[in-house]
């Protein structure tokens, strides 16, 4: 079993992640961190998970008990956390915020769009998950780019929410 921790567990993205992990045969959620909801049941916030879990939010961070840590935090918070906490060297991290999406010499996160970067994503220690608009645009344009069919300006109209 892959032992998972989640930071920023009260948001919409975290709710969907929790739902996916609860139904994953090889994942076990060890903790869901939310300082503002510590002690409350996850289903108090994510009502759609009622009957699926008895987990509660915690303000603790038992990083040494997990294999993978997901960040479902506001933009900027993942970077602050990484700079201010002693994160175990072997801990895999998947960031769902925008903090590490841009390639830089100051971090080792890889851009985690599997359709574009599958090999690197599978072996990476740190993965920066692309945002919804970037994913929409890239998945739509990658097949055209692969066949050299993008010859002019491109306009994308996308809606989220």
Question: What residue spans do the PLM features occupy?
Answer:
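N-terminal Rossmann-like NAD(P) cofactor-binding subdomain of oxidoreductases
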Residues: 1-161
């Amino acid at each position: 079993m892959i032992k998972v921790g989640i930071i920023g567990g009260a948001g919409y993205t975290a709710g969907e992640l929790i739902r996916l992990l609860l139904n994953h045969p090889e994942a076990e959620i060890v903790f869901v961190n939310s300082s503002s909801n510590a002690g409350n049941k996850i289903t108090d916030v994510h009502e759609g998970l009622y009957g699926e879990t008895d987990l509660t939010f915690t303000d603790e961070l038992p990083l040494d008990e997990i294999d993978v840590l997901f960040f479902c935090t506001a933009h900027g918070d993942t970077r602050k956390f990484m700079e201010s906490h002693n994160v175990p060297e072997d801990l895999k991290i998947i960031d769902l915020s925008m903090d590490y999406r841009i390639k830089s010499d100051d971090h080792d996160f890889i851009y985690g769009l599997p359709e574009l970067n599958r090999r690197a994503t599978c072996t990476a220690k740190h993965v920066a998950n692309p945002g919804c608009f970037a994913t929409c645009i890239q998945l739509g344009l990658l097949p055209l780019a692969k066949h050299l069919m993008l010859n002019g300006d491109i306009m994308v109209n996308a809606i989220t929410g």
